Regions:
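N-terminal Rossmann-like NAD(P)+-binding subdomain of aldehyde/semialdehyde dehydrogenases
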Residues: 1-53
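Catalytic cores of large soluble enzymes that bind and process phosphate-bearing ligands
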Residues: 2-17, 47, 65, 95, ...
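Alpha-helical scaffold segments in soluble metabolic enzymes
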Residues: 13-16, 20-23, 54, 72, ...
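Surface-exposed, flexible loop/turn segments at secondary-structure boundaries
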Residues: 29, 63, 93, 123, ...
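Conserved small-residue-rich beta-alpha loop and adjacent elements
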Residues: 35-105
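Glycine/charged-rich beta-loop-alpha catalytic/anionic-binding loops adjacent to active sites
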Residues: 50-62, 107-111, 133-134, 165-169
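Alpha-helical recognition segments enriched in aromatics with Gly/Pro capping
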Residues: 85, 91-108, 117-129, 139
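Conserved NAD(P)+-binding/catalytic subdomain of aldehyde/semialdehyde dehydrogenases
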Residues: 111-170
C-alpha cells in the first residue's frame, strides 16, 4: 500500500473526492441520532446507532479502474467508526498479479491497511467465511459481476450481511 503510486493529477482528484464524500457522510451522521419513546409506562422503543464491528469492501477490477468505488464504500465506514475495514481487490487483468494502484492509494489515504488480492467469488467467500490469514467480516459490500453477486447472496445464507443486489449500473 505504501509503495502505490499514481499521477499527481489523479492523487489530487482522489484527495478531493474523499474529502467531498467524507464531508457529506459526516453531515449525514450528525443528522442520524439515537432516539426512543415511551409507548406505555415502563416500555420504551427506539433506535440506537452503533457501527458494525467489521466490514469487507469488494472493489471490482478488470475493464476499468474503480478507485471511486473504493472511496464511496470506505469513507462511510470510516465516518461511521467501523473498527475493522478489510478490502478485497481482484488482480489486474494484465497477468502481473498486481492490484489497481489507485485503489491502494485510496486505502492509504483513509488509513486502511487490510487489503487482500483475490478474484470475485473467492474473495467474497474469504471475507465471509474467513481463511487462515483473513478473519471473517460481519458485512460485505461492493458491486461486481453476476458471480460476485451470487457469492454475496450465498454469504447471506451463512449469516453474513450484504447490501442489496447490485447490477453494473448501480
Amino acid at each position: 500500500i505504501r509503495s502505490a503510486k499514481v499521477s499527481t493529477e489523479l492523487h489530487t482528484a482522489l484527495v478531493d473526492a474523499i474529502d467531498h464524500v467524507r464531508r457529506f457522510n459526516e453531515a449525514l451522521r450528525l443528522r442520524l441520532t439515537d432516539w426512543s419513546i415511551e409507548i406505555e409506562p415502563g416500555a420504551r422503543v427506539g433506535e440506537k446507532l452503533t457501527p458494525i464491528t467489521s466490514v469487507g469492501l469488494f472493489i471490482p477490477s478488470g475493464k476499468a479502474s474503480y478507485p471511486s468505488v473504493a472511496y464511496q464504500l470506505a469513507v462511510p465506514a470510516v465516518v461511521a467508526g467501523v473498527a475493522r475495514i478489510a478490502v478485497m481487490v481482484p488482480p489486474l487483468p494484465d497477468g502481473s498479479g498486481n492490484v489497481d494502484p489507485a485503489v491502494l492509494v485510496v486505502c492509504r489515504l483513509l488509513g486502511i491497511g487490510e487489503v487482500y488480492r483475490a478474484n470475485g467469488p473467492a474473495g467474497i467467500a474469504a471475507l465471509g467465511f474467513g481463511t487462515q490469514t483473513i478473519a471473517p467480516v460481519r458485512k460485505i459490500v461492493g458491486p461486481g459481476s453476476p458471480a460476485v453477486t451470487a457469492a454475496q447472496v450465498e454469504m447471506q445464507r451463512h449469516g453474513v450481511a450484504t447490501m442489496m443486489v447490485l447490477g453494473p449500473t448501480e
